[in-house]
Every structure is written in C-alpha cells, then in structure tokens.
UniProtKB/Swiss-Prot annotation:
It comes from Parasynechococcus marenigrum (strain WH8102). The keyword Aminoacyl-tRNA synthetase applies. The keyword Ligase applies. Gene3D superfamilies: Anticodon-binding domain (3.40.50.800), Bira Bifunctional Protein, Domain 2 (3.30.930.10). GO terms for biological process: histidyl-tRNA aminoacylation. It comes from the Bacteria. CDD domains: HisRS-like_core (cd00773), HisRS_anticodon (cd00859). PROSITE patterns: AA_TRNA_LIGASE_II (PS50862). PANTHER family: HISTIDINE--TRNA LIGASE, MITOCHONDRIAL-RELATED (PTHR43707:SF1), HISTIDYL-TRNA SYNTHETASE (PTHR43707). The gene is hisS. The lineage of its organism: Bacteria, Bacillati, Cyanobacteriota, Cyanophyceae, Synechococcales. It is found in: Cytoplasm. This is Histidine--tRNA ligase. Transmembrane segments: none annotated.
Length: 430
C-alpha cells in the first residue's frame, strides 16, 4: 500500500515553522490594534457567485485558479481565493457599514490552483486589512504606511514601494480603448495569453510575465495619459502624503494588480532580501466593490501580504542580520527546563513538579520515555533547554530535584521538590 501524501501545493505547517508564523501574527495583531483595526474571521467556503461578481469573470483567478464545486444542495461553492470579497460580504450581511466606517483585519488560508513554487502554494495564507468607508487620499497614505511600518517592524529590509493610479471607471475605459487600438496594430508581437486577453481583459496584459510582451509595452500608452484632472490631483495628494511621512516610492505606470475591483491607488511593496525584488504585500482602492456586491456605494481600500513569501524573506533577513528583528522572530524558542526522570516514585514526583513549574509561568518539557539518563540528556540538549531537572531513585528518596545548567557554566543545585518558589527563582536566574 502506497504511503499517503498531502495534495500537491497543500503544505503541512510543522511546529518549528509555526513558531515563527505565530510570532509574526502576534506582531501584526498588536500593530493593527494600535491602529484601530479589529479582527474579522470569515468562512473558507463561499458561494462561487461572490468571487465571480467581486473579482471579475475575466480574471485569471476566476477563469483558471478557483477551487469550485457543486455541493449536495446543488449550490455552487468555492474555497476563497482571496480575502477582500469575503470581508465585504460579511460587512454587508451583518450591517456593519450602518455603524460607520469599518477598519478590519484578517488572517487565514486562501486557495488557488497555481503552479506551486517557493513562497507560493495552492493553499496559501494571507494577513490583510480592509478599511471600508475610507474615501480621502489621506486614508490611502495611512493604509500604505500601515503595511510599510509592519514590514519594517518585522525586520524586512530592502523595501521598495511601487504605486500607480488606476483612476476612475471612466478613466480606465478611455485607456482601455486607447490600449486595445495600439495593441491591435501589433498582434503578431503579442504572446498567446495576451492575445486572448485583448478581447476580455486588456488591462491584464500590462501584468504579462512574457519578456517580449513587456518590452513591447514599454512603447505603449500609459494609464497616466488617460487620467482625468480630478484623478491626477488625487494621486498627487497620495504622493505628497507619502513624501511627508518619509516613505520612498517609485511610480510604476504598468502596475494594475490582478483583480478587477481596483481603482485609483494601487500599490505593491517588494523586498530584495531574496536577491531579486520579490513582492511581499499588495493592495489598493476598490470604491466600486461594495456596490457591486449589493451594498450602497462605499469607498474602501486594503492590502494583503502572503505569509509563505514573507517567511522566506524573514529567513533571508535573519541570515543577513543575526541580531536583527527578523532573527528574533525566526529563532526557535526553547523550554526553560527539561525534566529528566526515571523510576516509579521519581516519575510521579516529576509530574507534580512539572505541573507546578508550568503554573508558575515557566516552559517545561517532561521526558516521558523512561529511557536511560544518557538518552534523556541528549534530548534535553537537542531541544535547547537552559536547565535539566533530574529526578532519579536517589533524588526521589530525598524528595529533592537536581538542577543542572545546560546552556551556561555553573554548578548543579538541589532543592526540595516541594520548594517550587526556590526552583522557579533558580530557573529564572540569567
């Protein structure tokens, strides 16, 4: 019988990885709390129509990448491929917008049928924020700064912010007409995917990964040429706000993002920690999405970062700076003590002692193997515990425990098993 394996692109998260994962989430949670964002959790499974209406029928996500099926009730269901549409659906369903603007954040798994590669899996995880009801250019600046400051706090180096304005729907329609006319004269120079997109979603051609197409687009008209004066003024205000905060940025007229609901400000933050610039966060404004999903016209802006890519970046940052913030996040935490025990009476005492030390706030690992002391000491060394607490027949007869330092120089000490306070004080001594 063959060994069962996880599905391709569905990756198990093991304890060592999750320690860093949870540390990142803890930093993000506190960062969002200080900024007035509340957490929201939405189901993994939604109606397929939510994403068709929200993301756009002509996108790669809806057309090629969604995990969709019909359930036993003949309902079309989809595992969520992104978080924004679900957050908006929840806000509308529960009447949150009737209470005013909503600042929300989320974290969790998403699903897309893509080719798995480093930092990108078919089940992937995101942390994201959505500010529903935010209209001004100043709110764009605040949301971008929220992402920039979080990445800096995590210790990600080599950050670069790219921004663009996608304007209003009228601006984009004018640009679409100009772009299609220009590209139709050069059909023989387009790759197959771009030719297919020309009639369905021509703006997505700007995001083509084909090098020849990208070279061709260098000569194409840009969205900036089609922006109305109001859209230009708004984008100027965003740039002025970022400059005032000291956040450097680069204008990228080809930046369109991968989902149809974006308009006005769009942005991506990249890092060079992996060698080439790799996107770790992206987002933008989506003023039409809430109305598109059945709500009143409401402005909104948000972003999401990919956890898998972020962890790769943090590992590289930790290697580059072993004393930096990223290194502290990546480091595996070790227990304060490892309890080595053998013999019936000693094992009973070890259980009682371990429980008392944990209640006092210490991280204590109890060896339950009953194996020889030598093997237990090796396990204590491997886990990185600062102290070994030794209970054998001799110690049990005296109702004592021997404390042996493992990570620093020092002499063994013995305390009565019942003297929890003295043991705790010793274990907490640097």
């Amino acid at each position: 019988m063959s060994q069962l394996q996880s599905l391709r692109g569905m990756v198990d998260l093991l304890p060592e990885t999750l320690q860093c994962w949870q540390a990142v989430e803890a930093v993000a949670r506190e960062h969002f709390r200080r900024s007035g964002f509340g957490e929201i959790r939405t189901p993994l499974l939604e109606t397929t129509d939510l994403f068709c209406r929200g993301i756009g029928e002509g996108t790669d996500v809806v057309g090629k990448e969604m995990y969709s099926f019909t359930d036993r009730g003949e309902r079309a269901c989809t595992l969520r491929p992104e978080g924004t549409a679900s957050v908006v659906r929840a806000a509308l369903q529960h009447g949150l917008l009737s209470q005013g603007a909503q600042k929300l954040w989320y974290a969790g798994p998403m699903f897309r049928y893509e080719r798995p590669q480093a930092g990108r899996q078919r089940q992937f995880h995101q942390i994201g924020v959505e500010w529903l009801g935010a209209e001004s250019a100043r709110s764009d600046v605040e949301v971008i700064a929220l992402a920039w400051d979080l990445l800096a706090q995590l210790g990600v180096g080599g950050l670069e912010l790219e921004i663009n304005s996608l304007g209003t729907p009228e601006d984009r329609q004018a640009y679409r007409t100009a772009l299609v006319a220009w590209l139709e004269q050069r059909l023989d120079q387009l790759d197959d995917d771009s030719r297919a997109r020309l009639s369905t979603n021509p703006l997505r051609i700007l995001d083509s990964k084909n090098k020849d197409t990208q070279a061709l687009l260098e000569q194409a008209p840009t969205l900036a040429d089609a922006l109305s004066s109001e859209s230009r003024q708004r984008f100027d205000a965003v740039q002025q706000g970022l400059t005032a905060l000291g956040i450097p940025f680069r204008l990228n007229p080809r930046l369109v993002r991968g989902l149809d609901y974006y308009g006005h400000t769009a942005f991506e933050i990249t890092s060079d920690q992996l060698g080439a610039q790799a996107t770790v966060c992206g987002g933008g404004r989506y003023n039409g999405l809430i109305a598109q999903l059945g709500g009143a016209p409401t402005p909104a802006i948000g972003w999401a970062l990919g956890m898998e890519r972020l962890l790769l970046v943090l590992e590289a940052a930790a290697t580059a700076d072993p004393d930096g913030a990223a290194a502290r996040l990546v480091a595996t935490s070790a227990p304060d003590a490892y309890v080595i025990n053998r013999g019936d009476q000693a094992e009973t005492m070890a259980l009682t002692l371990t429980r008392g030390l944990r209640a006092a706030g210490l991280a204590v690992e109890l060896d339950g193997s009953g194996s020889a002391f030598g093997k237990q000491f090796k396990r204590a060394d491997r886990c990185g515990a600062r102290w070994a607490l030794v209970l054998g027949d001799d110690e049990a007869a005296r109702a004592e425990v021997r404390l042996k330092p493992l990570q620093h120089e020092g002499e063994d000490r013995s305390w009565a098993v019942a003297d929890i306070a003295a043991i705790v004080e010793t274990l907490r001594t640097p």
